[in-house]
């Protein structure tokens, strides 16, 4: 019943969206406009936002390591808050892994899930003291999940070897974030062959992003096959929302006027409307609105709502695969280029 209600609501919202789109002149957009929008107005600013928050992690963790007496607890709270800020910025950036995120295998390097406590313990014993030493530490023992484990599951004590290692993990995160900013500043693909590859990659990664949120993060944990993401920090719901909002921004046409070609982030719906593919745009808008309603306020303890959300996300995936990709002449294929 709830799923049917969500579908009806989504259809009504999509109808309103279609009427709005017809009332607003939508210019023609090329694949180059779409790809440039993803890189310049999505990837680049999101990488900068993540780097800014990751840059504050070493100082926050270092303060915890140096704290004494009554200052220790507030220092841990501050380190945890800074981790949450960095994590949410990362979720927005990593929601659509394209370009340098794939080339640098950033999802594996920065977000290997779940963290491996035994490997973290081994890394603490090794006591890496600089960037070169951290390169020899495997991804399962560092990155955001490992730091979450060190701040919540087994909170590092001031002055302890584990705290010194947590500081190295934080510094490693900040370094990789800076490297992503530099990589994201490169010119987006322009020649015909590169553009075709980048377009196909981005469409496929959008499908993968929706499926990752649906299965790995929501449905699989409900079946006991995995833990909900960010459970230790209690930030699961925030993580889901950060990912979904980033995905939605790349799919759904906003209420504001469509961007002049080449000047902003271009949602897929807007791109479709600009190319006259109105039926596909309407179906996509309806599916996204159903998912948006089902994900709003969703928490790990939401019971049947979790299944409804997973079903709604499956609907978005099906529209992307069966309607959007063919309309854009993009072939959907399986890729294990990134992630774990």
PLM-predicted stretches and their roles:
Residues 1-6, 22-26:
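N-terminal leader/presequence-like segments
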Residues 23-340:
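Mature extracytoplasmic or organellar-lumen-exposed domains after removal of signal/transit peptides
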Residues 17-21:
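Sec/Tat signal peptide C-region and signal peptidase I cleavage site
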Residues 4-15:
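Bacterial N-terminal signal peptides
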